Amino acid sequence: MKKISLYVFLSLMFCNVSFGGILSEVLKKFEKTSTGCIEGDCENGYGVFAYENGDKYVGEWKNNKSHGQGTITLKNGETYSGQWKNATPHGQGTYKFFNGDKYVGEWKEWNFHGQGTYIYSDGKSDKGIYKNGELVESN
């Protein structure tokens, strides 16, 4: 009985080491393909890029940066969809917050900047000219 138990124990240890090694290799391959450019051309074209923090960008690229039209979906569910310049929102775009608020308008380097409308989840809104993220003139 002791011989059988030892044989079973050694067999299980071998299987665990073998399959554990295989599983480890499979997981490493998955990790490599689940972040970075996962589809298309993320250098100079149209591609999908998954960031390690869970964010994902789908859109146009120029010189390895988001540039042109694109959408980023953040890990928390918020999205920005619109124009990009050198990896920052720049130009016309829409940002949807996880609480239901939304900003539609002009952007400059991740800030509301220019003509835009901030729409609250209750339907109220602030329309006007924004500068560096702040409403400076209502209209």
Regions found by a protein language model. Name each.
Residues 7-16:
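Bacterial N-terminal signal peptides
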Residues 3, 16-139:
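Glycine/tyrosine- and acidic-biased, solvent-exposed loop/turn segments at the edges of beta-strands
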